[in-house]
Amino acid sequence: TFRGGGKRLRYFSVLNYKNDMGLLNSKYTDYTDRYNSQMKKYFLNLRMNLDVDITDATKLKLNMLGMLRETKRPTTSEATLFEQIFNTPSAAFPVQTQNGLWGSNNVLKTNPIANLADVGYYKLNQRMLQADLRLIQDLSVLTRGLSAELAIAYDNNATYQETAKKSFMYQTIEKGTDGEPVYTNYGNPNDELEISNKGLANQYIHANFEAKVNYHRTWDKHDFTASAMFRQESMTLTGANNSRYRQYIIGTVGYNFDNRYMVDVVANCFGSSVLGKNDKYRAYPAISAAWILSNENFMKGISAFDYLKLRASYGRSGYDIYDYDMDKQYWIGSGSYYFQAGNTSAGSSLKEGMLAMEQLDLEVADKYNIGLDMSLLKGLTFSIDGFYDKRSNILIEGSGLISSAIGVTIPQMNAGKVETKGTELSTMWKKEYKNFSYYIGANFSYAKSKVIENGEGYQPYGYLSKKGYPIGQCFGWEAIGYFRDEEDIKNSPVQKFSEVRPGDVKYRDLNGDKVIDSNDQKAIGYSTAIPEIYYGINLGFEYKGFGVDALFQGVGHYSVMLNTASVYWPLRNNTNISNWYLNDKIRWTEDTKDIANVPRLTTLDNANNFRNSTQWLENGSYFKLRNLNVYYNFPSSWAKKVKMEKIQVYARANNLFSLDHVKYMN
């Protein structure tokens, strides 16, 4: 970090380099001297801020951020690689045969180690530049408090791709009729490394221009601010029809009386190129008000309160990340026709595709908030907020809202609605002494969403509807145990998913029709997408330059479906089995039928057992030490000797421990 300058020019710059090495075994990532297939990430960031006072009335601000990033891995993706490692039993075959070829067998026909070491590499190089330039002109010569600003900004993010592929041969070993091993080779023995330099894989360019006029006056106990702004944005992504444009015309007015009563009003006229012709603009207002009670005379005698503020706000915003062709109808070439009676040969023709949207609109979010801020006892701060968000015009599938009798595919519609209510709290206590200081803070948020309209259409039973539940609410079957024997199966409702046997999961018949099918699902657990509760604790201290900072984070009211193959759902389609199933759980057998908590083992793809249900539902809440930072600040006298303001050495670690309910997976 470098900072300096004088009266007319000031600068600040930060250079940051980070190298993240992968966790793959170097014995195999260094398998060949032609390339290294280890997962690697390199980051190099350079930030520079420059402030120039051209004159006393004219100022220039330049901010720039440049980033170089390189990501490298085997040509086998991380997801595929770890899936193969999970699913391949460790004793299924040797990593390499005695002939030096990669091992495999006739069932799996893959080798995760070979797919790590001997398939080449995939590399992405990312180049990013973010720059903005702002000119500020004081116009007090015209009238006191008047100023103007001109700004331009340019972001360019480009990614270049290089792939080096090769194939390998693997060998299976089987016992012959004479008892001797029989070796069979599969795959391509070609050892050539085919390098494909795609060059520019994708590019995103974001540019904007802004012109703004500001006015600020104070007199007696009054403080008045106003501004008018015009902004033009353009965003371009690699590919066809990926450019979009936005315009903002924004006016703001703010008034403060005696630093006690404050009101701010914003009027935003927003235009988007994705909207139809002659229908490009929408209005998005906002208003906020605040009352600083601690500045009132009746609070002067209450020494415990250093600051007390009550505030409320309302605002509307829009969302326009939509495709361009939603208001157009296309004809597709999969139609057919017949000429003359008795002709059985169909001719090709066009037919109507999905209908066009009649009027595409923007998603709208109306946000209401009321809050209280306070500071107490010369060191304690506290804030509490209550909020209500109402989202409407959400783009959803229209097929559930219009009858299929129309005879053509229904387009999406701006008909979705979601409400969210919640509260947020935060507090901090700080104390400083001569050589020692410490702090401890906490935050908590609770937000519960409710789907009002999702376009799901008619449901034969009310409990099947996702309306009224949070976003991402988990739905599935209620598991009520396991079939004990054939008599139990005979006397129970018919489960339609697959043939059941003793030890298979037994589900509740919600509609009482003696059949277990898709009509017996219901809401189970919480959302699997968004936790309702977030909380955190941050604390630290410093003593004579030595300090520790720690951040703890947690979530609650969150569900996880344990459906990872081989880990929680074992042996399906010749996959693996984990310690979780073998040792941590009690699988169903004739001897354990009274205490079992997971179904019987089977190598078949058991559609009855392996589906979303309370059998596999787990509490997804956790509490973890997210960050720990230990540092030492050298005495300032040492720093001054080398012309620096501050010298600090530190050690930092992430995710040191976690308390949760999900074993083996994060």
Regions picked out by a protein language model, each given a short descriptive name:
Residues 226-234, 262-271, 507-530:
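Catalytic-site beta-strand/loop segments enriched in glycine and acidic/polar residues
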Residues 95-97, 114, 502, 555-648, ...:
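Extracytoplasmic gating/loop element in the C-terminal half of outer-membrane beta-barrel translocons
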Residues 49-58, 63-68, 73-78, 83-85, ...:
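Extracellular/periplasmic, surface-exposed regions of secreted and cell-surface proteins
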Residues 528-563:
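Glycine-rich, aromatic-lined ligand/substrate-binding cores of catalytic
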Residues 1, 76-77, 326, 432-529, ...:
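Conserved small-residue
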